[in-house]
Amino acid sequence: MSPPYDAIVVGAGAGGGLASYALTRAGLRVLLIERGPAYDPARDYPIGRPDWDLGDTFARSTPDTYVVEPQPLAADGAHLRTTLYRHQTTQREYSYQRACGVGGSTLHFLGEAHRFPPHAFRMRRLYGVGRDWPLTYEELAPYYGRVERLLGVAGQAHPLFPRTEPFPNPPHPLSPVSQRFAAGARRLGRTLVPNSLAILSRPYAGRPPCVYCKACYHGCVVGDKSSVDVAVLPEAQRTGRLTVATGSVVTHVLLDRRGEAEGIRVLEGADKVERIHRARLLFLAAGAIETPRLLLNSRSPRFPHGLLNDHGLVGTHLMENVYIARLYYFPERLASHRGVPIDAHLLDFVTPSPAGGCPQGFSLSSYGAPDGLKTPASFALSVPRGHGRLHRERVARHFGAHAMILGLAEQLPRQENRLHLLDDQPDAHGVPRVAIEVRFTADDRRMLERMVPLCDELATASGVAATAGQVSSYDLPNNTHPCGTVAMGVGPEDSVVNGFCQSHAVRNLYVTDASVLPTQGCGMAPSLTVEALALRAAEHAVSASKGG
């Protein structure tokens, strides 16, 4: 008896959603497994409550899932430490709590929809750092375009990212804050350009445009943000070939006698009922921490050290962003709490400059009022000092006048930055906890030292009145874009999957999340690249399964 599904997809985020979309539209019956719930924006998102900016909307992987060894900080790095949110520490501390739910990280992402520039695919060849990809920008460009059309991306063409067609929607108008930063950039001989965003700037595909409430991180109640649950999975569900199973934790990948993937073992619901699901194709898209965790836990006589781990590469080369976010006060209130979160960015430094001490590319972005500082309540709790009348006066004076510049650089891949299982420390589902080892290096510090004065230079040229503080990956990594732990490459000696996200060792197993990225894209957000890769991988799997 044949299984009821042709393909199983684990993880309903960016990569899993696009894989499910492509597979169902190709005629395959797909089971999409998600450990979190399906959210109802009207019921579950907090934007209608007065305290909406003070809490967290989405379920998270529990803190006891991961163990991270802190890293002592250098005594001479005080100027790089976090000063906002009253965070003071003598060591680097991590919190790898990922959002769980249908939509994955796109539930709370800020909508950035970036292509990686062509040079990001050839970092080793061009600049002698990082790794080269097993595919080129030109090969991925058609898939970028298709995903942009599906999501209704709003943007403006830029020479760094060659394209053969315009964006589906025009860019969002610059906020008053970004207009000030754009004027400052012009004074410096630089250009602040509109950000490309998976947030609708006009009605598109039956969905309304953005209302500029700036609540993207807490879930979009309007439906203009193109999260996977809103813009992608409904298209797959219309085929009648998609089954979504929520509240399901995958514990093992199962192999048949030939060494091919035949299914998964799952614990379903609060009662943790064990079930086995089978299919002829398997896509893992649980993220750069959970996907290698699942692979390492799926030991067998063929793979005694973990599935696909013949060469000890699963879980290695973990990358996180190197970032500095500087908060400033303008002399007047500019409604910085309104608009899309990051509506403009400076791309002058996306091309690396090894001779100038910057082997990684980076971007500077106009953030306005960042998450956690977007309402009077959250702002009052975090930034202005003082008590009583003085505190109230400072909140009244500075709220809406505060704006952030974000410097975002990629971290170079290093094999020693890795994760491994703690077999003697199971979590609530019996899956071993994960130990994460990531070191902040001299290269990372050089990038911070480079970005801080550039942020201040732009702020000064734009007329800011004062600096309010900063948040920094020097001591407070936010782990927004972890990637690289199941990296793609040419062969099994130095990679786990090929350029189609197909595993070298198990040919009917694909990985379609950020874990496959060999590098981070020189300061660009990864979700659009993950989605383009997933679309390409799914079409390859369909063709390969038909003998094409």
Task: Please provide the spans of the model-predicted regions.
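Glycine-rich loop(s) and the adjacent beta-strand/alpha-helix scaffold that form part
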Residues: 25, 29, 36-51, 239, ...
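Conserved N-terminal glycine-rich FAD pyrophosphate-binding loop of Rossmann-like flavoproteins
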Residues: 37-63, 99-108
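Conserved redox-cofactor binding core of oxidoreductases
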Residues: 56-58, 62-79, 84-95, 110-115, ...
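A glycine-rich dinucleotide-binding beta-alpha-beta segment and adjacent secondary-structure elements
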Residues: 194-198, 210-216, 245, 251-254, ...
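Residue-level detector of alpha-helix initiation sites
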Residues: 9, 13-14, 18, 172, ...
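A conserved FAD-binding loop/helix module that cradles the flavin
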Residues: 519-538
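FAD cofactor-binding and catalytic pocket of flavoenzymes
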Residues: 79-105, 109-110, 133-137, 311-434, ...
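N-terminal Rossmann-like FAD-binding beta1-loop-alpha1 element of flavoenzymes
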Residues: 7-32
